[in-house]
Amino acid sequence: TYTNNDYGKGLADSIQMNYEKLGGGVTINAAHEEGKGDYSAEVAALSQAGGDMLVVAGYLDQGGKMIIQSSLDTGAFDTFFLPDGMIGDSLPKAIGADLDGSIGTLPGTDSPGAKMLDDMAKAAGFNNGPFTAESYDAAALMIMAMQAAGSTDAAAYKEKVMMVANAPGEKIYPGELGKALKIIAGGGDVDYVGASAVELIGSGESAGSYAEILVKGGENTTVGYR
């Protein structure tokens, strides 16, 4: 089930397409609306379709959580797949041990830059949560592209993003933005690695990597990266 918006629909369709390519079967692909007080009808329809696991492409503090709780309460499902919008400490805390064994994914990498940003975050006293690395890197890429273009006009600096993001050039990690700007100002090249192991392909899409999450002992634990 997916939240009824562009994010949810696109994610659900992508999951179904790729899962079926691997030989899996999807029994139902149904939307749910956010902000409802009761999801028993939605859970009943999902349960009737059957399946070994329920994919909940929603939000952990909204309908997604309530669908999981209703599924557990009625015995409809006991194992869930949780995309990025459902990953957060509040969900296993709210659901408890019944969520153990569920799995999920979240953009992430075990690259050296990821640890560097994590250490910086801890030293500064803030939580390095989901999408922190990607947000940090997006801001850094824009700043470096502005420097390379000599302009803050998006029409001008967008042409420089690929140049500062990829090789050739000196590798740039979290905390080294000042160094990068000096290199660019001096006519040199940079290859921004950042916190999320940046590598842009095609028209500027991120090649991407993700963390594999397992809910265990009432907590989200990272068990691998791909």
Spans of model-derived segments:
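Extracytosolic ligand-binding ectodomains
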Residues: 1-226
